[in-house]
């Protein structure tokens, strides 16, 4: 799980202004960090099917946020996927 320090640094790197914690960019970055953590978790705990369902929910939520951002502002979308190293 992400510590509050890790969450703070992710928010700081992706926020649009000083008090921004809920923009799509920040939400996508936080979801990506949780997805990455769970992916590493499953390399060790292959039979943890309960958490795998949670991972699939997180991936779907990130996909919806990316689609929203793509429809609203294509430049910000491209910037986020490039910074996070995601596929289109």
Swiss-Prot record:
Subunit and interaction comment: Part of the 30S ribosomal subunit. Forms a bridge to the 50S subunit in the 70S ribosome, contacting the 23S rRNA.
GO biological process, one term: translation
Claim: RNA-binding is one of the keywords in the record: yes
InterPro entries linked: Ribosomal_uS15 (IPR000589), Ribosomal_uS15_bac-type (IPR005290), uS15_NS1_RNA-bd_sf (IPR009068)
GO MF annotation list: rRNA binding; structural constituent of ribosome
Record function comment: One of the primary rRNA binding proteins, it binds directly to 16S rRNA where it helps nucleate assembly of the platform of the 30S subunit by binding and bridging several RNA helices of the 16S rRNA.
Disulfide bonds: none
Keywords annotated in UniProt: Ribonucleoprotein, Ribosomal protein, RNA-binding, rRNA-binding
Annotated family: Belongs to the universal ribosomal protein uS15 family.
Signal peptide: none
Pfam families: Ribosomal_S15 (PF00312)
Official protein name in the record: Small ribosomal subunit protein uS15
Gene name tied to this protein: rpsO
Source organism: Syntrophus aciditrophicus (strain SB)
GO terms under cellular component: cytosolic small ribosomal subunit
